[in-house]
Regions:
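DNA-dependent DNA polymerase catalytic subunits
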Residues: 1-4, 11-292
Length: 292
């Protein structure tokens, strides 16, 4: 049996005069250093443990534990592919519109590393959503129907499935089937999230209007903020806020000097707050509703 685990290392190669090395040269040096690190570390590990070089990422976004995306190189600095784990592009319970905007941002950053181009793409995409230019099929979410729920009235697609069964008893959704739905405008406040969704066919037949903004607050905002929070200092629109942000970070570092985990957590919250204000607040979005 061979058990494996990963150890990520960061290298910042410099010239003798202290100038940071970038591009393909930095990538080549990093690969060689990583190979050497593995060989040296193995000498100090108890057999049969062995630390071997596997891959190098450039660029690389580490969102959280087991959630990352980057361009993967092995030994050839001219040959790479995109590699990701645990990001929204892998989730089945997100609407296609989420994958379109998130995937578009990732593509731009991974291919050209042009943060400003990614920001422009994001703003235009959000505008298209708010202007209701996104087709209905891009808003469809699907979730599997289970046999039992402890609180069925709080499970949106279960509420919808029951409603569909009452409308057409002969075609009531069965356990295990995937229920497609779209968030709709209700014209009044509703308590249950299940009352804010409908089947795509029913929407078309009855001329109902999709609630586009909920897709921003409930599915798009969080993952997109996590990306830009990591490159906040590189955003041109952040320039005027930078000094105030740095003061806040120093304050948090002093407050949580004995708790690194809490310090990182609160700094990331501060980063996300700035991204939200810079990219999302101007959209006049509703308060996010709880997801099920």
């Amino acid at each position: 049996v061979k058990n494996t685990d990963s150890c990520f290392m960061t290298f910042s190669p410099e010239e003798l005069d202290g100038t940071r090395i970038k591009g393909k040269k930095a990538l080549d040096i990093t690969i060689q250093l990583a190979i050497e690190c593995g060989e040296v570390a193995t000498k100090y590990l108890k057999a049969p443990h062995d630390l071997e070089y596997e891959k190098t990422f450039d660029p690389f976004f580490l969102l959280s534990k087991k959630r990352y995306v980057g361009m993967l190189y092995e030994h050839d600095i001219n040959k790479c592919k995109r590699k990701s784990m645990g990001i929204v592009l892998k989730r089945r319970d997100n609407a296609p519109v989420v994958k379109d905007i998130y995937g578009g941002i990732i593509d731009i950053i991974m291919k050209s590393q042009d943060i400003e181009a990614a920001v422009l793409f994001t703003k235009q995409f959000l505008k298209d959503i708010i202007d209701e230019k996104i087709p209905l099929d891009k808003l469809i979410i699907t979730k599997s129907l289970r046999e039992f729920y402890k609180c069925p009235e709080s499970i949106a697609h279960k509420v919808l499935a029951d409603r569909m069964g009452k409308r057409d008893p002969g075609n009531k959704p069965s356990t295990g089937s995937r229920i497609p739905f779209v968030y709709i405008k209700t014209g009044k406040k509703v308590k249950l999230q299940g009352d804010k969704i409908e089947h795509p066919d029913y929407i078309k037949e009855n001329g109902l209007k999709p609630d586009y903004k909920i897709y921003i607050t409930n599915q798009i905002m969080k993952p997109v903020m996590q990306i830009y929070a990591l490159v906040l200092e590189q955003l041109k629109i952040f320039k005027k806020r930078k000094k105030g942000f740095e003061r806040k970070v120093r304050s948090l570092e002093r407050k949580w000097k004995d708790d690194d985990k809490k310090c990182v957590e609160y700094i990331m919250k501060e980063r996300n707050k700035h991204v939200k204000e810079l990219l999302f607040n101007e959209a006049e979005l509703p308060v996010p509703i709880e997801r099920t």
